[in-house]
UniProtKB/Swiss-Prot annotation:
SUPFAM superfamilies: 4'-phosphopantetheinyl transferase
NCBIfam families: acpS, pantethn_trn
Family affiliation: Belongs to the P-Pant transferase superfamily. AcpS family.
Presence of the UniProt keyword Acyltransferase in the record: no
Gene3D superfamilies xrefs: 4'-phosphopantetheinyl transferase domain
Keywords from the UniProt entry: Cytoplasm, Fatty acid biosynthesis, Fatty acid metabolism, Lipid biosynthesis, Lipid metabolism, Magnesium, Metal-binding, Transferase
Superkingdom, taxonomy of origin: Bacteria
InterPro entries: 4-PPantetheinyl_Trfase_dom, 4-PPantetheinyl_Trfase_dom_sf, ACPS, Ppantetheine-prot_Trfase_dom
Organism of this sequence: Bartonella henselae (strain ATCC 49882 / DSM 28221 / CCUG 30454 / Houston 1)
GO cellular component: cytoplasm
Subcellular location field: Cytoplasm
Protein name: Holo-[acyl-carrier-protein] synthase
Entry GO MF terms: holo-[acyl-carrier-protein] synthase activity; magnesium ion binding
Length: 133
């Protein structure tokens, strides 16, 4: 069953401005080490960061809290599987909020889709609960 749904559309130019203005301070505050390493290894860094930013916003919406309600940016992180497929990894308060959404004796899978077409980056999150076992 679906217990959370979120989407976000981010302007890549906005992320470019944040990177130019705040540089490493912005990147360190928002993105996990894995996200930074992935984005910095790519030619289109700003597009990569923008997709990950959109994914975090979409995830916070799917969790029902938004960013302002105690969930830290780094409590949500996009990880790419060896196949390249992106997944969302939750820790700390984001993980606790996810547990609150789940019916008893259920686990969750977080489905993530990200795309970009300059100047836009977009992400969708679906949180699905399924019975354990």
């Amino acid at each position: 069953m679906i217990v959370g749904l979120g989407s976000d559309l981010t302007d890549i130019r906005r992320i470019e401005r944040m990177l130019a203005r705040y540089g490493d301070r912005f990147v360190q505050r928002i993105f996990t080490d894995i996200e930074r390493n992935r984005s910095e290894s790519l030619q289109k860094k700003s597009s990569s960061y923008a997709k990950r930013f959109a994914a975090k916003e979409a995830c916070a919406k799917a969790l029902g809290t938004g960013i302002a309600c105690g969930i830290n940016w780094k409590d949500m992180g996009v990880i790419n599987l060896p196949s390249g497929k992106p997944i969302m990894k939750l820790t700390n308060r984001a993980q606790m909020q996810l547990q609150k959404l789940l019916p008893s004796h259920h686990d969750a899978i977080i489905h993530l889709s990200m795309t970009d077409d300059f100047p836009w980056a977009q992400a969708f999150i679906i949180i699905e609960a399924f019975p354990r076992g």
